[in-house]
Amino acid sequence: MEPNMDANSITITVEGMTCISCVRTIEQQIGKVNGVHHIKVSLEEKSATVIYNPKLQTPKTLQEAIDDMGFDALLHNANPLPVLTNTVFLTVTAPLALPWDHIQSTLLKTKGVTGVKISPQQRSAVVTIIPSVVSANQIVELVPDLSLDMGTQEKKSGTSEEHSTPQAGEVLLKMRVEGMTCHSCTSTIEGKVGKLQGVQRIKVSLDNQEATIVYQPHLITAEEIKKQIEAVGFPAFIKKQPKYLKLGAIDVERLKSTPVKSSEGSQQKSPAYPSDSAITFTIDGMHCKSCVSNIESALSTLQYVSSIVVSLENRSAIVKYNASLVTPEILRKAIEAVSPGQYRVSISSEVESPTSSPSSSSLQKMPLNLVSQPLTQEVVININGMTCNSCVQSIEGVISKKPGVKSIHVSLTNSTGTIEYDPLLTSPEPLREAIEDMGFDAVLPADMKEPLVVIAQPSLETPLLPSTTEPENVMTPVQNKCYIQVSGMTCASCVANIERNLRREEGIYSVLVALMAGKAEVRYNPAVIQPRVIAELIRELGFGAVVMENAGEGNGILELVVRGMTCASCVHKIESTLTKHKGIFYCSVALATNKAHIKYDPEIIGPRDIIHTIGNLGFEASLVKKDRSANHLDHKREIKQWRGSFLVSLFFCIPVMGLMIYMMVMDHHLATLNHNQNMSNEEMINMHSSMFLERQILPGLSIMNLLSLLLCLPVQFCGGWYFYIQAYKALRHKTANMDVLIVLATTIAFAYSLVILLVAMYERAKVNPITFFDTPPMLFVFIALGRWLEHIAKGKTSEALAKLISLQATEATIVTLNSENLLLSEEQVDVELVQRGDIIKVVPGGKFPVDGRVIEGHSMVDESLITGEAMPVAKKPGSTVIAGSINQNGSLLIRATHVGADTTLSQIVKLVEEAQTSKAPIQQFADKLSGYFVPFIVLVSIVTLLVWIIIGFQNFEIVEAYFPGYNRSISRTETIIRFAFQASITVLCIACPCSLGLATPTAVMVGTGVGAQNGILIKGGEPLEMAHKVKVVVFDKTGTITHGTPVVNQVKVLVESNKISRNKILAIVGTAESNSEHPLGAAVTKYCKQELDTETLGTCTDFQVVPGCGISCKVTNIEGLLHKSNLKIEENNIKNASLVQIDAINEQSSPSSSMIIDAHLSNAVNTQQYKVLIGNREWMIRNGLVISNDVDESMIEHERRGRTAVLVTIDDELCGLIAIADTVKPEAELAVHILKSMGLEVVLMTGDNSKTARSIASQVGITKVFAEVLPSHKVAKVKQLQEEGKRVAMVGDGINDSPALAMASVGIAIGTGTDVAIEAADVVLIRNDLLDVVASIDLSRKTVKRIRINFVFALIYNLIGIPIAAGVFLPIGLVLQPWMGSAAMAASSVSVVLSSLFLKLYRKPTYDNYELRPRSHTGQRSPSEISVHVGIDDTSRNSPRLGLLDRIVNYSRASINSLLSDKRSLNSVVTSEPDKHSLLVGDFREDDDTTL
């Protein structure tokens, strides 16, 4: 491959992200942009790193694309960095199945492909790729007819430069790491961080307490690296901002361009070098054959490597190389560089061998599936001279770095060191000498012998086999485990479908599907089947499936408190013991915090096992207690805080208000005296100063000002403490909020008053200054009251979520059973200690702690708080139970299937939490407005101050006329300043961005909470807002409009009743169909069992199935069945009847009290055998049976109604006709009618045939139908409707509808019970009720209406309140004091929250409420009113409106055609339809018994 630079990388700062949902949204949306190859978004660093094609995108366009999503995107550095790309040369190896244009288009659409050049004449293609995004092997897999061109590849490699272009876009990061005490600490950090994907290199310095890291920002962020270091137990701090760098010469050498191996593999490598050596590497991180191919491709092309064999099963690679040109360490790094961060490579063994030896020649031709196993030995060395744990750590740190040492554990107590090592790389003697070199006395045990390592010399026949001296063992099948992300599941039937079909496949041992998590865990034999094949099998079932590469590790995380540790030796003892346990991936113990962080595989080991292991070491371990309560949702702490602040402020505010009222009364009294006696200004001053409160204690300090100051101080700095904290935090983060405004207003008023009071005292003024000490107490009283009421209201908005969280159980009773399922012991454990597979006992009245399956017992379970299902649900062995539901009567034993965060309840809680914290698009407008609001208000306040000062000095009469409480004892200048200052502070007090900020989130929280209580899960603000804009509702048919399972509609007996009875026919048919796996057969069997009131049927032999036609078999042993069953009396036993129609649904027959049966039947030993045929017309004709015209016409009528008609023959005589159909849900017609009455267009879209679709549409009242639409075409249909300018809601059961649900403006998934498809839709209806579709749109409209009302309140309040406060309306007498402004401000926030709480009064309309409407408004339609569109084409096929003569002609033609052929054209069916409504209510009713 030839390196070049056709891609750039840019890092964009993104503001406005609040949660991981924002990160996913940006990655999904920008990832779809044309020209974007890869994007990595970091919430912590508020940045997005994008790899893109510079020919299609620029940094500016990417910034604008993120801006358009509602986030603030900033380009601090607009200069992009180049990203390494490679050139792949492809050639045609077989006749092309696809045209060149299609191949080029396919390749260009692939992420990571930057360019494609096609040469049809030379039958080749040149593809430019980004190797970190897509590999050459993946390109070849996309186009099977093309393969890598080795000739061109080698030619290009030979002419290339000595050094390839370095990987651009790498970043250098330096971090300060505290708490490191020895080299073991540095090794731990380097080992942990060095394995992370995206980390290229790391060096930790113990002396400098510093880590230097080189990483790729598009794969990992600095914050993630910091978290990983802290997870090990060391505090880490970023010293300086990361900066981009270029690689050095050594790294350039490692990345040197090399040709790709030939298609023959590594076997056709260049001849061996004179000094060839063979080495075995252990490789962790390989998941599939693609990994094997990538490593072999990369290594086999290096000049100094003669051959390589990689084994996926043994996780190893054997490399033959020239030891004079390259070292094993370079080879190890070369393997890790194939996919940085994915592979973890260690050296297992190295054997030098001359090239002429048999082993070398055999190694070149080594088969892929044969590899030597790495060999390890253990030695115990006696060590004397150790005095403390520092000695222990020193020995462990030095020896652990020696080549070949796998692990070391030094015991200070026993004076020993236990070392596990690779005997091919080292031996006990060098290890003993190394310890002695450190100053200790080291002695090997007396009986110590050098381990004998037998290495089998590989031969041509058996290369690198183990020693032949060992007995040959029978290989047991290997079990591997993989995880597959499954999308499109909506209910338990989807789960059962996947599990049932996968278990049938060879090589698959077990399957466990988690519906809520959308994940399947599969155990398989890697020699038989691979994960990608399993994913393809799931896709064939109609679901989306992707192999989760890294899901197998770290899927269990445990936080423990460990008590009893005293030193670092204790820490090491716990860590080394646990990491040796199978199933534990990682363990980190922090001595300072007494905490252990453990990652484990729940399938192999559980939390109780880990705690027990630590206990056996002499320590006490317990779970870190987590707050499972919903206290953070009910705002109790905030309510208590603001209540305290309000009471403190109120305590000091009441005297201040008393003083203010007293002064207002006295000022009014003086003004009256002045008006009556016309006193001079000097007399007014004397009169004013003679008042008690105006008397001066000190010159310039009056009693009034002193009392006001003393009362203001505690309020300002105690009652207002929380405001100062919040304001400081806001300003520190360079933002301004409501708290900043409040602190500004109160601090300015307090500081101004204090300054002028001090100045007056300094000048010994005779006239007391006018102060504003009364402003802060009054402001804080009303603001604290507002916050108190606001948090009380907010607590109410989260009641639904708090109720869900409170359902979670805290403890579980785990029982132990013996082989006979008898109870041996019980144990109460914390619910977080429950492991998958545990047997749990749930007593009556108890909560189910986890999801599980009942293994013993019967009971009724209340699931109403989770599913909304009012009636208790019966549970028996095999039934699934949900965490949080309540057991009513009867004890149950359940086996845990999903625990911890995987339970259904946890997933629903997580979904509702994410929904309530997500933002609606309308909220983005409010957020931007609030961002500019505070600076704008501060500016308006300053302008108000200046304007009134200017007006006052220009025209004092205006201030004199409108200044409340003005008297001439105050100087003009002081009056002007006081009036302007008062207006300015009032503007600060009355302005409130809080009401804007609360308008949307409070309504969204209440709306989603109310929805959850009513079984409607809405995923956040965006779908909640979007649903009210919907103009078209598209329904899927199967499982949505209909029940999704076929049922028997009618049974017609076609023989005289004295020949064979109806019940006998049902017994024979039920027995015959019981062996069928076809859904129609299952429906027939179920119906027969219900009619005969039995669970057992006869015996079926010689069963044969002919797909597309029917079945044949022989039935016996039905006489006993008929004798035991409580059979019904035959009605109207008319001998001349040739056909009896019996309704399968509404028939009501009284049970017979007696039955006449021939004695020989009941007592017969050899029962009669019946030859049975069941199937369609073609099956009957094949078997030589003649179908009469009457029967054929009856079948035509059923088929016209969208039913499947099957015929039954017993002993070569046509005996019955059975009509089967998927029935319409009872509420479907009502739901469609209501949606239409709401002004919405309703469309039916189905993959079924047009006849069935037309029939269903006519029953529910839908006039527009898209029939015979493939699942892949449903997306196109939705998109087509959207292109017409319509907002589309897609309603489906999610099995084949998930792409269309994702494409729709609002995707609504209908589930049964709690089985919810959280990835397939925006709105999930827990109950299988179509009226919830109406309720979800109705709730959306109510919520959006409430949001708009809230915005009107907030905007009108600010638009009117601010001008009033600024004094604009003084001419009409509107004047506000600062305390009035603060009261109004508090009232605005409370009013918005209370307005949102009105949504809690919402009641979902019920079926009974809807049924109160007049029955004349039913929505059934005649065929002529229905427009059917077939397939992907948009050609409308309207039913023709024919005249009477045309109808008679067409009916006759249809009858003649029915005798000639079994296939009906669309037109013949459509024209032969009578009016549907007349059929449903007229003579041809389903509950009639018709005799032909």
Curated annotation (Swiss-Prot):
A Pfam family: E1-E2_ATPase
Glycosylation sites: N678
InterPro entries: ATPase_P-typ_cyto_dom_N (IPR023299), ATPase_P-typ_P_site (IPR018303), ATPase_P-typ_TM_dom_sf (IPR023298), ATPase_P-typ_transduc_dom_A_sf (IPR008250), HAD-like_sf (IPR036412), HAD_sf (IPR023214), Heavy-metal-associated_CS (IPR017969), HMA_Cu_ion-bd (IPR006122)
Enzyme Commission identifier(s): 7.2.2.8
Phosphoserine, modified sites: S270, S339, S353, S357, S362, S1422, S1424, S1452, S1455, S1458, S1461, S1465, S1468, S1478
Stretches of the chain found on the membrane's Cytoplasmic side: 1-645, 727-733, 795-927, 1004-1348, 1398-1492
Function comment: ATP-driven copper (Cu(+)) ion pump that plays an important role in intracellular copper ion homeostasis. Within a catalytic cycle, acquires Cu(+) ion from donor protein on the cytoplasmic side of the membrane and delivers it to acceptor protein on the lumenal side. The transfer of Cu(+) ion across the membrane is coupled to ATP hydrolysis and is associated with a transient phosphorylation that shifts the pump conformation from inward-facing to outward-facing state.
UniProt family annotation: Belongs to the cation transport ATPase (P-type) (TC 3.A.3) family. Type IB subfamily.
Protein name listed in UniProt: Copper-transporting ATPase 1
Annotated organism of origin: Rattus norvegicus
Taxonomy of the source species: Eukaryota, Metazoa, Chordata, Craniata, Vertebrata
